[in-house]
């Protein structure tokens, strides 16, 4: 398919320094597009400026600044920052939606999550549900909500536990299977949809990764990758996980949200709506992720300890 997008039209990328946003920004720049990268830290945007992007510093809760950031743009990649509280999620999604409406933006690819169809009791996914609804209420906006699976990168949080305790642990049941996706696959998919702008109205697309995996299976792949064949998965209590998140610097309200999400996954409240298909399956296997990303991060941790 060839793009119908005029080459001098501007693309705006929120969260450009993050895992998905950086992939999108680099893809669009490589395709010769005009790109405006938005973030709170101008220093983290400099690598894109060096490639020809325009940097715009703004907080995601500042509707006036975001309206300026979206000014004159044809399309944007929208995402909420990591959840620190429901109140902050609401402020951010309110500001983004207001800016989209007031700027007259016509196309948006919005990072959401599988399970965002559920309106309550799913932790940070409730905020994504609300964000989808706010964007859906904007007339004239063509919005594509990407309901991505559980990020493979979330498993990087286990590195410290592997090094310190010799196990992988979180609140998920050992054998509950969930779709796991590499953020690079999300970024690549979003970039292609932005390049083509081949969607209209309000649409959702689940992205379910290469296959569904349980934490027992995840741990086995990690064990092979890092050469620790005896590594095992241990389910931790919700209270243990909540405290561990707080110890890692997650605000208490945010930690409670993530625990609520784990409960919803365990209880099969958070599940994909779409059957797995070629359209929602992405190429990066967890084995590839471990080889390409996890092992290097693990070795970096152990060498710096």
Regions found by a protein language model. Name each.
Residues 2-5, 225, 239-305:
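A hydrophobic C-terminal alpha-helical subdomain
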Residues 183, 215, 238, 285-286:
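Structural motif detector for alpha-helix initiation sites
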Residues 58:
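Cofactor-binding loops of NAD(P)H-dependent oxidoreductases
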Residues 70, 74-77, 109:
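N-terminal Rossmann-like NAD(P) cofactor-binding module of classical short-chain dehydrogenase/reductase
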Residues 52-53, 143:
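Short, conserved active-site loop motifs that form the nucleotide-linked donor/cofactor pocket
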Residues 80-84, 264-267:
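Phosphate/nucleotide-donor binding subsite
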Residues 2-47, 61-64, 71, 82-91, ...:
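Oxidoreductase cofactor-interface core, primarily capturing Rossmann-like NAD(P)-dependent enzymes
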């Amino acid at each position: 398919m060839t793009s119908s997008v005029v080459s001098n039209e501007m693309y705006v990328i929120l969260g450009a320094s993050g895992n998905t946003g950086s992939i999108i920004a680099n893809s669009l720049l490589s395709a010769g597009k005009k790109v405006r990268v938005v973030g709170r830290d101008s220093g983290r945007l400099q690598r894109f400026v060096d490639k020809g992007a325009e940097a715009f510093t703004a907080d995601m809760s500042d509707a006036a600044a975001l309206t300026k950031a979206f000014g004159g743009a044809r399309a944007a990649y929208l995402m909420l920052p990591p959840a620190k509280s429901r109140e902050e999620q609401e402020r951010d999604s309110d500001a983004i939606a207001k800016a989209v409406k007031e700027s007259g933006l016509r196309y948006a690819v919005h990072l959401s999550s599988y399970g965002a169809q559920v309106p309550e009791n799913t932790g940070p996914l409730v905020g994504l549900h609300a964000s989808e609804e706010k964007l859906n209420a904007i007339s004239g906006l063509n919005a594509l909500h990407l309901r991505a699976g559980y990020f493979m990168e979330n498993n990087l949080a286990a590195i410290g536990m592997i090094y310190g305790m010799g196990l992988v642990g979180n609140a998920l049941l050992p054998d509950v299977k969930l779709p796991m996706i590499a953020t690079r696959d999300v970024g690549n998919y979003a970039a292609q949809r932005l390049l083509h702008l081949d969607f209209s109205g309000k649409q959702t697309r689940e992205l379910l990764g290469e296959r569904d995996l349980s934490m027992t299976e995840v741990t086995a792949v990690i064990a092979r990758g890092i050469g620790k064949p005896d590594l095992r998965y241990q389910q931790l209590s919700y209270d243990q996980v909540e405290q561990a998140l707080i110890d890692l610097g997650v605000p208490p309200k945010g930690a409670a949200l993530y625990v609520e999400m784990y409960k919803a996954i365990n209880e099969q409240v958070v599940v994909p709506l779409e059957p797995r298909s070629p359209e929602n399956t992405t190429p990066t296997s967890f084995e590839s992720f471990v080889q390409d990303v996890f092992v290097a991060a693990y070795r970096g941790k152990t060498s710096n300890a």
